[in-house]
């Protein structure tokens, strides 16, 4: 500030000093905003990671199901939870990716859903029993969805 008020400078030089000070101030503000955005992204990524850890912990209980019906119910519930988390992750990505990036992600998501559902159908075909068919289908969907959640988490780096 003292430079801008220095009487030995011409009006033109004072104007240049003020412009440079404004540019510096703007750059500092922009850097601060970027740091805040990076921190928010890291916090959101950590929140997703924590939720995934909780779901993984819950998934460990599936192996202790007393019978196939309980295993089916637990696996179906797990799939729903992973699928909900996946939706939350896509909702978040919609806020941080640019339009082209998100459009690309959205297109790959639609293809991914088709692959997931097709894989689940194929898994179910490999058994005759209705409960076993449903279990195979949900197990495939749960595993495939879980893997996709981890891929999206990596995208958030």
Model feature map: region roles:
Residues 1-157:
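N-terminal alpha-helical modules
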């Amino acid at each position: 500030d003292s430079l801008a008020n220095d009487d030995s400078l011409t009006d033109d030089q004072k104007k240049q000093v003020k412009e440079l000070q404004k540019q510096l101030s703007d750059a500092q503000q922009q850097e601060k905003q970027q740091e805040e955005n990076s921190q928010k992204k890291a916090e959101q990524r950590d929140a997703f990671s924590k939720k995934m850890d909780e779901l993984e912990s819950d998934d460990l209980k599936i192996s202790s199901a007393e019978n196939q019906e309980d295993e089916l119910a637990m696996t179906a519930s797990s799939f729903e939870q992973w699928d909900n988390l996946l939706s939350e992750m896509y909702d978040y990505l919609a806020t941080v990716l640019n339009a082209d990036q998100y459009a690309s992600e959205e297109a790959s998501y639609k293809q991914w859903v088709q692959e997931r559902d097709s894989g689940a159908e194929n898994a179910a075909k490999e058994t005759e029993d209705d409960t076993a068919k449903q279990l195979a289908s949900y197990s495939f969907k749960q595993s495939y969805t879980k893997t996709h959640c981890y891929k999206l988490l990596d995208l958030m780096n």
